[in-house]
Structure formats: structure tokens, C-alpha cells
């Protein structure tokens, strides 16, 4: 039942839609919350209001709150606790509120996996699993999966049924090479994963072959997938139609090729008819249409005709492009007859059946293997929970008694990030919610425009169905609420985002209509200054190479060009960052609500992937700008990791020549190339390891060389490692290798040493994690690492810069989701989308299952079957829709400045292609074919921006501008501005050096290379030092002190007056430690001292009790000497002082005798103002003074000579910092209870 929403008070800050989302109830509710609209705050406040409501409040454990991450769940739980505590303060007598606070830790606020885990733990007795199960880690699951799928294939090969074996071989021949059957293992594993997002995986699997078992009367139009091919054909026909339309327009120009006009009209009508058939006709009609397409010959243009030759050529070029598109469509889809296409589908049914059978066997054996080990994985959690929540009735799944109990328990089910759920998760949610959509208790929050996890099998169509069906007002279905007020970004960022996505995002291409309900509305409190969004297009010089030359490049050349793009874009970003920092750019601080200077940590660089991360990090390092890159790549390519992995490979099997050679060349063995060659020559016909042993035997019999000694040490350690590998743990072996080789210390001394050591620690930690699984052994671990590398599951190198430091951040767009940054660079906008999944001979889909290429096993020919073609078109449309959403996430991360950076090969050609969009009616979005063929973000943004008024400075044609409040700064930048060619620079220097005529330049260069640095002495000084260090250095220069002032008259000691004072001798603590203890006592002792020695002793004991002194220190404090201090003249003045400051730390800048500035730190023992207003500097000394010299007049001179520098610096610090005059500088010598005046 729909309930009335309370009236919003005038003094609340919620928008009307937010208020509605917080209080709406009585039916399922979908909140479509755009970026920056405060959806998390709305969700949390809805929970809070449900619990603290005065009318019909619910208990906090009657809410089921499902979040996407554990961090989100923890934040919600914390904010709920804070809200309850605040409510209790306002209503301290409420027993309900106090009870909620005690229930908060029992509340089901978690990820869906955690909720499923709770169900499985509680009801494990309903399943055939060990109640003491544990969640397996990814490494263990991966290893087990690899073993099981290999066993399944091995078992299939060994089958006694000939028909089954033949079916297996046909399957293998269809999808693998002659080398191995790894592709079949991958195919089985991926098909298994796809099946697991369905509530009934086995039923879904067995439906796949049926889709290929077509009845005779079936036509292609009966196949749902054929719609996607027709849509693609239509897009191509529309593109050809635009080209012919442009050709026709050219023929009608005054100086255009008029003789072409008749042909253009024929072509125009022909393609128009094709578009009609693609929309309304059958497949057979389309086939017949392409079979009859004929291109007539263009009429000859008379030489005497007044025709612009360039227009004539342009008309030809447009027509040829249209013909190319049409011919490609025919060759791709309409060469084979419809009957042939259907027959190819039927022929694939047995192969699909065999694959499904193997996947089913694998699924069961994998399940049993996990049961045997008492483990489950995350996918099992959801399926076991579903098993507990359902019972099968007449072949359909119905809620079980457990599900019915949960329906009663949970008064509301709230789901965050609903756009990222899949079909299985939706099924679980439906089983625990109450009612139907029109009277249910399911509250869903999300933004389908930010659904970017399809690769994890998320299904955004779930959100889109409800979005289109739920009404904005209560009716016979659920309620939809749109939150589009953006509290994050400046209006310039939002206007540009709206401008772009209104043109590119539609229902057929983009899966979402970006209308007024979806557009972002500015709501953040920024000032009115104009901050345009920047579009930067990097391009090579136009005269550097032709387009044809660019297209003819080899793969290696393209790779080098890609490297250049990353460098150029990095250098522009560095330059732009420097410019902003130097120009005093400010950003708005939401905490202080004021403008403040831009910091590095305000800046982020977003990229689709981290492929360029290494290049960007290197460029930023050279530029001196700190960059933090959270990369998941490059770990296994790190030199130190490769070397240790090679050591492990050789320990496992020494008969691996390349790893063994790598280990011998490593610094901890240290063989040269010549030494390796000598070993190889010992016996070139045997494996290298045998040659190595033979070399050692032969060398050992003669004069033992350095090479022999290196190898002997290595082989001794090597045999120990092999022994440990057989009987010990893997992690111990790795650490033993580190210790024996000292390699861990070696890499620490290399550049980026901390990072390299962290990489080695990660390898050790990975071994520890591996050992926690049911697997053991070095061989399996190495195989596991190899599989990780094959699958691309890199670990990412350790980082020496922390992400909380004041650094620029480089992150993927996916990692940035949910975050915000004042300044956002989106780099790599011109990089092509990743289409690697379309290169396989198979494709997966949650709706249509599996599509494979047609195989002719007899002729060994592969065809692109119609299901494969259709599913490829569907997946490409989905891929582009996902990329649009990724772009949306990237652009909406920016709070104040958004800078889009991309590279193109040829700016003039790119600009002309973008300008084609200027012919579109001004009230229409970009044509579907333009959006559907895009291969990069620039392919969407460029044509859209070309219709904007700010593009006029770049345009070569006139056009009608789109009406838009957005503001762009468009910058095509020649890469020559950022071409720092180090080799060319070196070549130029070399040329100058070898030019005999320029002797003056040569002399100047030589003089500079041999120049002596003027301030060489200053380089040996510390820029920051202590008073003690200054004192020590000055005393080292003093050579005049007489020998008899030292504690050992017969032997001169270093720089101290004596090794120890009398009261410090025969103690376990050092003199420094006991001197510190005395200073501690003097720091805390009362100003008026004590009347008795026992009182001083009690005071010291109290310091020990308070742990300000250790027991050992308390025992050696000279109690009597401390007592006597207060009975000396200086002690009496201390007792009568007006102010006292003790243990006063300071830091000052001072200039030394060479004129160099130094930062000096120190701690002043005591500073007091006596009863006459004089400031006295008092310093305590515990140096030992020999008795027969204690009263010598020379002692004063000696003591002050030693400590004058210290007292002078202390005095300078006091006068500089406190702005007071030091009247006296006094040393108090505890050893002989004497005062020495400076």
C-alpha cells in the first residue's frame, strides 16, 4: 500500500526528490541517482529515519542493506551508530533507541556475498557441505580448477566409447591448434563461469545445444539474434546513404560535376530501398536485395565543362566509400544463402552438445573436489544460499520456509549500486523481499549510466527494465525517483557532460536515452568564474608523413608510435600541471568553504587501463613531479622478481638452460658472458647443467680459477636449496635464497631499492598464501605463477610513494568510481577500444548463451556462422554502451577542472571527419551509425564538439551551431612542442665536439667538464644539524688544551673531559644514559626542591612509578648531588625565579663561519627569570672532573672553551625566538657541585 510522504519542512537542505526518496514507502522503489547527487546520504538517511521514526519504528536488525563493497557497509554501520547516539541524546528515555544501539552489530548491513555467507553458515545443515567450511582464496581455486578441467579432458580422451572420443576430437579440432588443448580448457572454464550467474546453471547449459537444433521450418527471422545483424546492416546502409547524399549535393553545386547527378539519384534511391528493407523486410528480402545491387558507371565529364576538379574528385571519393561499405556488407552477411546459414547452425549442434557435456562433468567434479577439501568459493556462496532459499515445485523454484521467515523478518530490503547486480543476485533479493512491485519493500539505488562491470557479468538491463516500467507516480507498479541535482561539480563540467551524452547516448546505441531526466543539474556552491573544459588533441606534424605511410607501418612501428603517444600526452599533462601551479590556480575547499591553492593531491589522471602507466611514471619522474600509480601490471616483469623465479625454476629442475644461464649471470653468482661461453664449450652436446658440472670437475683438478670459486660457492648453496625444497616449506626456501645470496640487500642498493625489496617481500608473501591452500610443492607453485602470467593476472609492483601523500594520482577509471577530484585529466582518449574478446572463435552471452564459428572438419575451413556474426554485433553494441558509461564515470569525477587528452595520427583528416557531423539537423543527436562505429572516446567527443560554437576556430566549413550552455577550449597541439629527443641532442653535441673549426667551443666544454665547484666545502656540510654536532666540530679544531684536564693523565682520550663522573662509575648504564636520567629529574623536580635527601629519593621513586624513569635509571640518579644543587647560589636563585622554562626544544636558522645557512636543532636544559628580571640560561653537565684539578682556575677556562659554542647558540635561539635578552649563561657541574659562569 502506497503511503503518504510527509511534507518537507522549510528548513531542511534536502531537495524535493531526495526528500521523496528518503520517505517513499509502500511499493518497490527505484532511485536513479546520477553522479554526485548524494545517493549514499539518501540511502543512509532513509535507514536512519526508518529506525528512529516516532510512528511505527522498526528495529535495525529488521533491515537488510546490501552494498557493493565492505567499505560502504562499514561506513553505513558507522553513520547509523552516530545517528542513534545523537537521537539518544535528544531522547534519553527511549528504550527503543537504546535497544537499536545494542543491535547495530547484529544488523545485516553487508555485501550480498556476506549476506549469503551468513545464510549458509546458519543453515549449513540443510546442505551436503561441511559446517566447518572455509572460503578458499583465489589462488587455491585457480589451481584446483586447472587440475579438474585437465582431468576432465584426460578422462574424455580415455573414454571407451568410440563415438564420445570422436566427438571430443572434433571439438578439440574446432577450437585448438596442433600444440595443445589449452583453448578447450579455457572454453570450458569460461562457459562454466557464464552459467554461474544463472539461478539454474545446469538447465541453462543444456539449453545451449537446443538453440542449434533447428527445425526444418525455422527461418532466419525466427532467430532473435538476427535482429542485431539487421541493425548493423541498417547502420552501414545509413552511412552509405549519407555519403551518396553528400555526393548528390556536390553534383548540384554550380561548379560541381553535374553529369554525375543522374547516377547519384539512382544510387540514392537504391540505398534508400535497402534501408527500408533492413527495417521492415525479411532476411530473404535483404539477401535478394544485395544480390541485385548494381553500381552503374559514372558519366564522363567533358573536358570543356566548367567543373571544379577537386569537387569532381571528392564526389568520386564519396561514391567509392559508399560502394566499399555496401560490398563489405554483402561479403560479410549475404554471400551464403539463408538455407546454407541455417544448415551451418544445425551442424554445430553436436559440437555444442559435447562442450556442454564436458562443462557439466567439470562442474560436478569441481563441486566434489571443493567438498572434499572443505572449501567453497564466492560463486558457491550465492548458489548455496539460493539452494537454502528455494524449493522446486512442478519444475519451478519457489520460496523455501527459510525464505518465508526472512520475508517476515526484513521490513525493508535496501540495495546500493543496484545497476551492478546480476540475474542470480536479483533472484536472491526477490526471495527475501516481500510483496510484488506495486506493494513491495525493495528499495534500490543506483545509476545505470555508471554500470561499468559487465566484464564481471553485471546485468544493467535489470535496472533499465525497472527504470522504463516503474512510474514516477504511484500506480500499478513500482515507483521511480530521479535524483539529478549534482552537488559535486562546477556547472561547466556538468554542461559539457550533458552536451556530450545527449548526442551519443541512446536506447539502440548506448542502451540508455540521455534525456532531461538523466541530465545533470548544477547544485554545488561554486563562484561564477568561467572554467572551460579542455579538449587537447595531440598530433604529429602534418608534413612528417602521409596518411598512407602511417597506415603501412609494421606492428613494431605502431608499438613505437603508441609509446610516443604516451610520452607526448604525459609531457603535455606535466606542462599543464606546472602551468596551473605557477599561475596560482585555486580550488574550493569544502571543509573550510574557501578557496585555497592547488596541490598535487588535488589532481588525478584517469585512464581506461594502466598500459601507459610505466611511461607516465617515468616522464613524471624526469619532470620532478610526484606521481602515484596504482598499477596491477609489471610485477612479473620486474628484474628482481624474474631472477628469483628463475632460481626457483632451476631448483625445481636444473635442466632448464635459459633460467640457469640467467641465474649464473645474476649478481650473486656473477659470471660473465665469456665465462658462460667457457662452460658451454666444456661439452656443447649435453644440457647446460651437465656441462656446468663437467666444467666444475675439470677446473677443480687443476689451478682453481675465479670462475671455479664462484661456481663452487653457488653449487654448495644450490644443493642446500634443492634439499630444502624437498623437505621444507616454499616460503622458507625463498627467504633462505634471499639470505644466502644477499640479493635482498643487493636490490636495496639499486635504484628504487625500497620498491625492489617490497617486490621480493610480495613474492615471499604469495608463497605463504599458496601454502595455506591444499596444494604443496615448488612445481605446483611455479605452474600457478605461469598460469597467472598467461591469464594476465599480474600483481602490480610495490610502490615507494604512498597514496595519501601530496602526489598526483594515476588510476583507472574503474578505480575512480565513487570518488571525486578537483582537477581531472582523462588521458588516452584516442586509444582504440579493447576488442580482444572478439578475436576468439567463440563468444558468450548471458541471454543467448554461446556462439561459435562454423567448422568444416573435413576441409579444415572455418566460417563465421550467423549466430557468431549476430552475437558479435550484439556484444560490440554492448561494449560500446559500456564504454559510454565508462566515459560518463570519468567525466563526472571532476569537481572543477576537466581536461580531456587524446592523440590522433592526422589532425586535418580527423578534423574533416568530425565536421561531417555538422550536417546533422541541430536538434538531433549524432547518427546511430557514427556512434556504433566509434573505436575510441575521441570518435564520440570529436563529432559532438565539431557541432559546438567553440569549434569555429578550428572548422574549415560553415555550420549551424548547436545551442548549448557548455564551454570548450579546444587545443590541437603539434607533438613537436613536446619532442625531447635525447639521442638527437647527444648527436648535436658530438657533432660540435668533432668540429675542428670550433676550437673555442671545444675548449669551453673541456673547461666545464674539468671545472672545480666553487662551493665544494659546503657540499660536505649538513643543511640540518644539532648543537652537539656544532660543538663537536669546533672542539676537533682545538689543539691547545693541556693533557692534565682529562680523566686519564697518562693517556690522552678523545674529546671528553673524562670517561665518566665519579657517581657514574661501576654502573651498567652508559654515561649518556645516566646523564639523561639526571636531566629528567631536573626537568620534573619542583621549583623549591626538597628539605631532605629522603624527600629527593622519594621523588625519584615516584618518577620510576610513573615510568618517567626506568628502575635502573632510578638507582643511579645521584640523589645527594641533586639535593645539594638547591643549596648552591644558582640553586637558590632558581628557587626564587619568577618564570622557569625547562627542556625547551628549538629550531633556528643560522649562518656559519663560511656564510652557509644551516638549520640547527637543540634542547635548552633551563631558562629562568630571576627576581630582578634578568634571564639566566642554565645548562647541567655530568662530566667527571678529577679531584686535584676541580678548583683550578684553568678549569673554568677549559670548561667554557668546550661549551662556549653550545651556550652561544642556545642564547641566539632564545633571543631570536622569545625576543628577550639573555643576561647570564651558567654551567652547573654535578660532579663537583660547581657553578661556572660564561
Curated annotation (Swiss-Prot):
Assigned EC number: 3.1.-.-, 5.6.2.4
Start and end residues of each UvrD-like helicase ATP-binding domain: 12-490
Reactions mediated catalytically: Couples ATP hydrolysis with the unwinding of duplex DNA by translocating in the 3'-5' direction; ATP + H2O = ADP + phosphate + H(+)
GO biological process terms on file: double-strand break repair via homologous recombination
Record-level GO cellular component terms: cytosol; DNA helicase complex
Domain (UvrD-like helicase C-terminal): residue spans on this chain: 510-818
Full protein name: ATP-dependent helicase/nuclease subunit A
Species this protein is from: Lysinibacillus sphaericus (strain C3-41)
Amino acid at each position: 500500500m502506497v503511503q503518504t510522504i510527509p511534507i518537507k519542512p522549510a528548513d531542511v537542505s534536502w531537495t524535493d526528490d531526495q526528500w521523496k526518496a528518503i520517505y517513499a514507502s509502500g511499493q518497490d522503489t527505484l532511485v536513479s541517482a546520477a553522479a554526485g547527487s548524494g545517493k549514499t546520504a539518501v540511502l543512509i538517511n532513509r535507514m536512519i529515519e526508518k529506525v528512529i521514526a516516532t510512528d511505527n519504528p522498526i528495529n535495525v536488525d529488521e533491515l537488510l542493506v546490501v552494498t557493493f563493497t565492505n567499505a560502504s557497509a562499514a561506513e553505513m554501520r558507522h553513520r547509523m551508530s552516530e545517528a542513534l547516539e545523537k537521537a539518544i541524546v535528544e531522547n534519553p528515555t527511549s528504550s527503543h533507541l537504546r535497544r537499536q544501539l545494542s543491535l547495530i552489530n547484529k544488523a545485516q548491513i553487508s555485501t550480498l556475498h556476506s549476506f549469503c555467507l551468513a545464510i549458509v553458515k546458519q543453515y549449513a545443515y540443510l546442505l551436503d557441505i561441511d559446517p566447518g567450511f572455509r572460503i578458499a582464496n583465489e589462488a587455491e581455486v585457480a589451481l584446483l580448477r586447472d587440475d579438474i578441467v585437465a582431468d576432465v579432458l584426460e578422462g574424455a580422451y580415455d573414454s571407451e566409447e568410440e563415438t564420445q572420443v570422436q566427438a571430443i576430437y572434433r571439438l578439440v579440432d574446432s577450437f585448438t591448434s596442433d600444440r595443445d588443448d589449452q583453448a578447450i580448457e579455457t572454453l570450458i572454464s569460461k562457459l562454466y563461469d557464464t552459467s554461474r550467474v544463472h539461478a539454474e546453471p545446469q538447465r541453462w547449459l543444456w539449453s545451449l545445444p537446443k538453440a542449434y537444433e533447428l527445425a526444418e521450418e525455422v527461418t532466419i527471422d525466427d532467430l532473435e539474434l538476427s535482429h542485431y545483424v539487421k541493425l548493423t546492416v541498417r547502420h552501414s546502409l545509413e552511412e552509405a546513404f549519407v555519403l551518396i547524399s553528400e555526393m548528390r549535393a556536390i553534383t548540384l553545386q554550380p561548379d560541381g560535376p553535374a553529369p554525375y547527378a543522374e547516377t547519384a539519384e539512382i544510387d540514392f534511391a537504391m540505398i534508400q530501398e535497402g534501408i527500408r528493407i533492413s527495417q521492415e523486410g525479411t532476411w530473404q528480402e535483404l539477401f535478394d536485395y544485395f544480390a541485385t545491387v548494381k553500381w552503374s558507371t559514372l558519366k564522363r565529364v567533358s573536358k570543356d565543362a566548367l567543373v571544379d576538379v577537386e569537387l569532381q574528385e571528392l564526389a568520386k571519393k564519396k561514391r567509392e566509400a559508399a560502394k566499399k561499405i555496401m560490398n563489405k556488407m554483402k561479403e560479410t552477411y549475404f554471400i551464403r544463402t539463408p538455407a546454407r546459414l541455417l544448415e551451418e547452425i544445425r551442424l554445430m549442434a553436436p559440437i555444442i552438445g559435447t562442450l556442454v557435456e564436458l562443462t557439466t562433468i567439470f562442474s560436478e567434479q569441481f563441486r566434489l573436489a571443493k567438498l572434499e577439501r572443505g572449501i567453497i568459493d564466492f560463486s558457491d556462496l550465492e548458489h548455496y544460499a539460493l539452494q537454502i532459499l528455494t524449493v522446486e515445485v512442478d519444475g519451478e523454484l519457489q520460496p523455501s520456509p527459510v525464505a518465508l521467515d526472512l520475508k517476515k523478518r526484513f521490513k525493508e530490503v535496501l540495495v546500493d549500486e543496484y545497476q551492478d547486480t546480476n540475474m542470480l543476485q536479483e533472484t536472491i533479493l526477490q526471495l527475501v523481499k516481500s510483496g510484488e512491485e506495486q506493494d513491495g519493500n525493495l528499495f534500490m539505488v543506483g545509476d545505470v549510466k555508471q554500470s561499468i562491470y559487465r566484464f564481471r557479468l553485471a546485468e544493467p538491463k535489470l535496472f533499465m527494465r525497472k527504470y522504463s516500467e516503474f512510474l514516477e507516480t504511484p500506480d500499478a507498479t513500482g515507483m521511480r525517483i530521479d535524483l539529478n541535482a549534482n552537488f559535486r561539480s562546477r556547472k561547466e563540467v556538468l554542461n559539457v557532460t550533458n552536451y556530450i551524452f545527449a548526442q551519443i547516448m541512446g536506447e539502440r546505441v548506448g542502451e540508455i536515452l540521455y534525456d532531461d531526466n538523466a541530465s545533470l543539474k548544477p547544485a554545488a556552491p561554486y563562484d561564477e568564474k568561467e572554467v572551460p573544459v579542455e579538449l587537447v588533441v595531440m598530433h604529429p606534424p602534418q608534413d612528417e608523413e602521409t596518411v598512407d605511410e602511417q597506415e603501412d607501418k609494421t606492428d613494431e612501428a605502431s608499438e613505437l608510435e603508441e609509446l610516443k603517444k604516451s610520452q607526448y600526452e604525459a609531457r603535455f599533462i606535466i606542462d599543464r600541471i606546472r602551468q596551473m601551479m605557477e599561475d596560482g590556480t585555486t580550488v574550493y575547499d569544502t571543509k573550510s568553504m574557501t578557496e585555497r591553492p592547488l596541490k598535487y593531491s588535488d589532481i588525478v589522471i584517469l585512464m581506461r587501463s594502466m598500459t601507459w602507466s610505466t611511461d607516465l611514471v617515468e616522464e613524471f619522474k624526469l619532470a620532478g613531479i610526484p606521481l602515484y600509480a596504482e598499477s596491477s601490471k609489471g610485477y612479473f616483469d620486474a628484474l628482481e622478481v624474474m631472477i628469483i623465479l628463475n632460481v626457483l625454476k632451476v631448483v625445481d629442475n636444473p635442466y632448464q638452460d635459459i633460467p640457469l644461464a640467467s641465474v649464473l649471470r645474476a649478481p650473486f653468482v656473477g659470471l660473465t658472458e665469456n665465462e658462460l661461453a667457457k662452460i658451454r664449450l666444456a661439452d656443447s652436446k649435453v644440457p647446460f647443467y651437465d656441462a656446468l658440472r663437467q666444467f666444475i670437475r675439470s677446473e677443480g683438478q687443476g689451478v682453481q680459477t675465479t670462475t671455479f670459486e664462484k661456481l663452487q660457492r653457488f653449487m654448495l648453496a644450490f644443493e642446500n636449496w634443492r634439499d630444502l625444497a624437498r623437505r621444507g616449506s616454499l616460503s622458507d626456501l625463498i627467504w633462505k635464497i634471499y639470505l644466502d645470496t644477499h640479493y635482498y640487500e643487493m636490490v636495496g642498493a639499486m635504484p628504487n631499492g625500497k620498491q625492489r625489496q617490497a617486490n621480493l617481500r610480495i613474492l615471499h608473501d604469495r608463497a605463504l598464501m599458496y601454502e595455506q591452500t591444499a596444494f604443496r610443492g615448488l612445481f605446483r607453485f611455479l605452474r600457478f605463477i605461469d598460469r597467472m602470467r598467461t591469464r594476465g593476472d599480474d600483481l602490480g609492483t610495490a610502490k615507494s610513494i604512498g597514496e595519501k601523500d601530496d602526489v598526483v594520482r594515476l588510476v583507472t577509471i574503474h578505480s575512480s568510481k565513487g570518488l571525486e577530484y578537483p582537477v581531472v585529466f582523462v588521458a588516452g582518449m584516442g586509444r582504440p577500444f579493447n576488442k580482444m574478446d572478439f578475436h576468439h572463435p567463440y563468444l558468450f552471452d548471458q541471454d543467448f548463451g554461446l556462439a561459435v564459428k562454423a567448422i568444416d572438419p573435413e576441409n579444415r575451413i572455418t566460417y563465421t556462422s550467423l549466430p557468431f556474426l549476430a552475437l558479435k554485433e550484439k556484444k560490440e553494441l554492448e561494449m560500446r554502451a559500456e564504454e559510454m558509461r565508462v566515459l560518463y564515470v570519468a567525466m563526472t569525477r571532476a569537481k572543477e577542472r576537466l581536461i580531456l587528452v587524446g592523440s590522433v595520427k592526422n589532425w586535418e583528416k580527423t578534423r574533416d571527419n568530425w565536421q561531417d557531423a555538422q550536417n546533422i539537423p541541430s536538434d538531433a543527436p549524432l547518427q546511430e551509425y557514427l556512434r556504433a562505429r566509434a573505436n575510441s572516446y575521441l570518435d564520440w567527443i570529436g563529432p559532438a564538439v565539431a557541432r559546438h560554437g567553440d569549434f569555429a576556430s578550428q572548422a574549415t566549413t560553415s555550420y549551424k551551431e548547436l545551442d548549448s550552455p557548455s564551454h570548450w577550449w579546444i587545443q590541437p597541439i603539434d607533438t613537436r612542442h613536446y619532442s625531447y629527443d635525447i639521442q638527437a641532442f647527444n648527436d648535436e653535441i658530438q657533432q660540435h665536439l668533432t668540429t675542428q673549426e670550433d676550437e673555442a667551443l671545444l675548449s669551453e666544454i673541456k673547461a666545464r667538464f674539468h671545472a672545480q665547484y666553487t662551493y665544494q666545502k659546503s657540499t660536505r656540510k649538513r643543511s640540518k644539524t644539532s648543537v652537539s654536532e656544532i660543538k663537536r666540530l669546533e672542539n676537533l679544531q682545538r689543539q691547545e688544551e693541556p693533557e692534565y684536564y682529562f680523566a686519564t693523565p697518562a693517556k690522552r682520550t678523545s674529546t671528553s673531559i673524562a670517561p665518566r663522573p665519579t657517581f657514574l662509575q661501576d654502573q651498567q648504564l652508559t654515561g649518556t644514559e645516566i646523564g639523561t636520567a639526571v636531566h629528567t629529574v631536573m626537568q620534573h623536580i619542583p621549583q623549591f626542591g626538597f628539605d631532605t635527601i629522603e624527600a629527593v629519593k622519594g621523588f625519584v621513586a615516584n618518577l620510576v612509578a610513573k615510568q618517567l624513569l626506568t628502575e635502573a635509571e632510578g638507582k643511579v640518579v645521584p640523589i645527594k648531588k641533586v639535593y645539594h644543587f638547591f643549596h648552591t647560589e644558582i640553586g637558590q636563585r632558581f628557587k626564587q625565579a619568577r618564570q622557569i622554562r625547562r627542556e625547551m626544544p628549538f629550531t633556528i636558522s643560522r649562518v656559519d663561519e663560511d656564510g652557509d645557512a644551516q638549520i640547527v636543532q637543540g634542547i635548552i636544559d633551563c631558562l629562568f627569570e630571576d627576581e630582578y628580571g634578568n634571564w639566566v640560561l642554565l645548562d647541567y653537565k655530568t662530566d667527571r672532573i678529577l679531584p686535584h684539578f676541580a678548583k683550578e682556575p684553568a678549569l673554568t677556562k677549559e670548561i667554557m672553551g668546550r661549551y662556549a659554542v653550545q651556550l652561544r647558540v642556545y642564547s641566539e635561539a632564545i633571543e631570536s625566538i622569545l625576543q628577550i635578552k639573555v643576561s647570564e649563561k651558567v654551567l652547573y657541574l654535578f660532579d663537583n657541585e660547581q657553578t661556572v659562569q660564561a
